[in-house]
């Protein structure tokens, strides 16, 4: 038996180790091992983290419709799970590729037995969850309701598989800015005013399934250790390294100080050293027997600077005393306890002023809270820092110039580019991501963790392929590429401006820019809705959370602020049409609340009640210190003005829809009729019926131009009517301010014969319009009246443009100019 095991071990060592791509198939393959009914065995000596992961693996088998029972059996495929040094059966295999490795797993087969082996407890756990993932259980099965497809069978394809070692040693999340969303959801879900071990157990499982290993717990109003003593124990059992945030030194949560401020005294090390050292010592006493990481240094009380000055000597004294406490409490040299110093905001000034921490301490640099790396190690001395470098990165932020808390606004490309920049400059020891409430930051979390494990899997040119693969693995649908495109397009649009910074003044309403960006979102929402109908029912909640809701919410927000911009624009011109836009603002504001209500109360059966309670409409400064979302201000215009339209020139032109005349005169037995939806823009106008003489019929358009204009060009756009009367062409006249009328023959050359067929006829009928121009002299300032008189029946007018230097030829003749009535 020993010889057989030795032979197998040699085979394993010599076999080519593949990346853990696909070793599970759902179609029969020759010599593959069936998984419909399997057994799993592990050693009682193994880590508790491994046993918990095995229990989750059994549950995952059930989720996909398969069976995995503990123990061994002659029937079905057996799975052996174990960690080097903790499972004799694993040790006997002599898996050389695992020895001395960090968090590495190997999945292989020994004959007809599947083996999942890890170099340490997390390596084994990652191997277990890799099998779960390949069976179709996404890391997001619970946190985002990723669908799980039922299977009648699955097969393990024989071979040896691994993902190697992680590129970054410490890979974690920071729950932050947790009120009101996460706190509300926890209260609704777990019935507590804080995160207890039941909540954190779900967070830890997600981190491990994503091949992460670290957490900074929420700290605004919660105290991880004090709220529930089981929290820290649960982290240790499951194999998650705990840390505390950049301003919470010595394994103490800020709330542990804030709740007992009178007892501990001032957060001032120079004046209150004795009490603060005692506070620090208690934190190290609590964590000394764990893998937990210790934040060193000190900031001011409540995530603020200690003072206006950069007191290097004081910081040196603080760190020296903290290191002394670590050594005294643990009974080990200080460098045997992992420590980090965060160069966050003003703390970087200490570094720039020459302060240096001991060689073993991780140097944690930060982004600017908006996803841009502030600095990287540059000098040879910095690059060789033995403790290594880390990055603290944000996809959630509270602070100036404006909060970003509601939904994800981080572009995939920016995150990839900046994290690649960090990694390529040697920031490879620790990556920590500020994820706010965790939801709705699901995809940035996935991308961050995948990059922390192996940042070289993708390039900047094909990073969107990561998004496609993510949705393919989680949704399991053929539309994954389209889903990914919608997701990335939405990120691109949100990258233009965050929802908290968006308002009516963001885009230019006069140039049509506002309408363009609102239309961009409207088209994206239509795409997302069409795709929703094709998503399998079991995947729709996941699709709603990650794709449809963010698109709909932002599209609606754009509609609302566009409507506010139009209301302001038209109200200035005194136009009662401003009132319609004011009503649209109210409608969109109400829809926003309904979308959030649906997310909280209806989606996934109300499972995520509370996550969409973040205020996002009504910011006046960086923070959200207002009671609730506020309806944007609008202006109502009294609708008692004359019926006619008066236009205001803008940017060197006046653009007028033909139906918006100041006055109209019809001949006996006729009337001016508006044809809705006729033409390229809004409508068209014609004197009807065509069988009656036109007489003295006329349309008059009124507008204002700036002083000093001496000449202009009038563009008259009509339907491409042919000379059906055979009178040598339909004619109309154009006159400005009572000047001598100029006659325009609009269709004399519109005949399908040479020499006009290709030059005049085909272009006009293909474009469906005839555009003629008339040059006019401008003899006065102020208000002007342009009169157009048809000389033949059957002329259909669509648009009038008066150009005095600013009109740019466009297919739709520019957006209509502002007007009043």
Residue ranges with predicted function:
Residues 1-24:
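Bacterial Sec-dependent N-terminal signal peptides
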Residues 146, 150-151, 464-614, 697-699:
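C-terminal non-catalytic alpha-helical accessory regions
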Residues 98-270, 288, 340-344, 354-372, ...:
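Feature activates predominantly on carbohydrate-active enzymes
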Residues 78-136, 198-202, 210, 249, ...:
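Intrinsic-disorder/low-complexity accessory segments
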Residues 154, 219-220, 226-237, 264-386, ...:
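Gly/Pro-rich turn-and-neighbor structural signature
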């Amino acid at each position: 038996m020993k010889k057989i095991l030795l032979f197998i071990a040699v085979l394993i060592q010599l076999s080519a180790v593949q990346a853990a791509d696909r070793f599970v198939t759902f179609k029969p393959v020759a010599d593959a091992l069936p998984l419909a009914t399997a057994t799993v065995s592990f050693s009682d000596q193994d880590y508790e983290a491994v046993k918990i992961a095995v229990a989750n693996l059994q549950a995952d088998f059930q989720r996909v419709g398969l069976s995995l029972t503990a123990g061994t059996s002659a029937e079905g495929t057996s799975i052996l799970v174990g960690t080097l040094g903790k499972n004799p059966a694993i040790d006997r295999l002599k898996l050389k590729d695992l020895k001395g490795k960090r968090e590495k797993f190997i999945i292989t087969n020994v004959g007809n037995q599947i083996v999942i082996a890890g170099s340490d407890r997390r390596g084994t756990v990652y191997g277990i969850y890799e099998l779960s993932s390949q069976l179709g259980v996404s890391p997001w099965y619970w946190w985002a309701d990723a669908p799980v497809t039922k299977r009648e069978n699955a097969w393990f394809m024989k071979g040896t598989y691994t993902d190697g070692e992680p590129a970054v040693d410490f890979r974690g999340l920071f729950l932050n800015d947790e009120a009101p969303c996460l706190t509300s959801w926890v209260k609704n879900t777990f019935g507590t005013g804080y995160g207890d071990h039941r909540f954190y157990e779900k967070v830890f499982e997600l981190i491990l399934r994503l091949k992460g290993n670290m957490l900074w717990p929420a700290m605004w109003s919660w105290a991880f250790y004090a709220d529930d003593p089981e929290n820290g124990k649960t982290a240790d059992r499951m194999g998650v390294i705990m840390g505390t945030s950049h301003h919470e030194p010595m394994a103490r949560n800020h709330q542990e100080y804030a709740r007992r401020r009178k007892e501990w005294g001032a957060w001032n090390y120079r004046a209150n050293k004795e009490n603060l050292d005692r506070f620090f010592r208690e934190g190290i006493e609590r964590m000394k027997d764990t893998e937990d990481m210790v934040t060193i240094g000190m900031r001011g009380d409540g995530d603020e600077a200690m003072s206006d000055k950069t007191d290097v000597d004081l910081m040196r004294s603080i760190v020296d005393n903290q290191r002394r406490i670590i050594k005294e409490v643990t009974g080990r040299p200080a460098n045997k306890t992992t420590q980090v110093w965060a160069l966050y905001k003003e703390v970087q000034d200490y570094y720039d002023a020459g302060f240096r921490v001991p060689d073993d301490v991780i140097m944690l640099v930060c982004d600017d809270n908006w996803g841009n790396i502030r600095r990287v190690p540059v000098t040879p001395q910095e690059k060789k820092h033995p403790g290594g470098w880390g990055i603290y990165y944000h996809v959630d932020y509270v602070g100036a110039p404006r909060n970003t808390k509601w939904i994800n606004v981080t572009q995939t490309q920016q995150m990839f580019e900046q994290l690649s920049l960090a990694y390529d400059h040697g920031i490879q020891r620790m990556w920590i991501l500020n994820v706010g409430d965790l939801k709705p930051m699901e995809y940035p979390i996935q991308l961050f963790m995948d990059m922390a494990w192996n940042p070289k899997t993708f390039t900047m040119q094909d990073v969107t392929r990561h998004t496609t693969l993510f949705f393919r693995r989680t949704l399991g649908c053929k539309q994954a590429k389209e889903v990914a495109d919608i997701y990335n397009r939405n990120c691109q649009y949100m990258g233009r401006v965050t929802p908290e910074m968006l308002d009516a003044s963001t885009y230019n309403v006069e140039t049509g820019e506002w309408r363009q960006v609102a239309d961009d979102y409207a088209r994206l929402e239509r795409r997302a809705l069409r795709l929703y109908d094709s998503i399998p029912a079991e995947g729709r909640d996941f699709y709603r959370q990650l794709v449809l809701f963010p698109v709909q919410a932002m599209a609606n927000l754009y509609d609302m602020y566009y409507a506010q911009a139009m209301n302001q624009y038209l109200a200035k011109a005194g136009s009662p049409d401003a009132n319609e836009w004011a009503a649209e603002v109210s409608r969109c504001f109400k829809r926003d609340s309904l979308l959030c209500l649906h997310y909280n109360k209806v989606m996934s059966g109300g499972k995520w009640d509370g996550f969409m309670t973040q205020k996002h409409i009504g910011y006046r400064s960086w923070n959200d210190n207002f009671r609730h979302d506020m309806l944007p201000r609008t202006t109502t215009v009294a609708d008692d003005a004359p019926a006619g339209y008066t236009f205001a020139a803008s940017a060197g032109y006046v653009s007028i829809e033909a139906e918006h005349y100041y006055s109209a005169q019809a001949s006996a037995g006729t009337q001016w009729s508006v044809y809705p939806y006729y033409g390229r823009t809004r409508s068209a106008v014609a004197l009807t019926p065509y069988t009656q003489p036109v007489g003295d019929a006329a349309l008059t358009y009124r507008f204002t131009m700036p002083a000093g204009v001496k000449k202009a060009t009038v563009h008259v756009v009509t339907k491409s009517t042919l000379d059906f009367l055979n009178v040598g062409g339909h004619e109309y006249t154009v006159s400005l301010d009572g000047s001598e009328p100029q006659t325009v023959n609009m269709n004399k050359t519109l005949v399908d014969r040479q020499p006009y067929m290709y030059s005049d006829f085909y272009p006009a009928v293909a474009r469906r319009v005839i555009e003629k121009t008339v040059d006019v002299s401008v003899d006065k300032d102020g208000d002007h009246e342009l009169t157009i008189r048809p000389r033949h029946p059957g002329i259909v007018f669509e648009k009038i443009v008066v150009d005095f230097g600013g009109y740019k030829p466009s297919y739709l003749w520019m957006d209509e100019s502002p007007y009043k009535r």
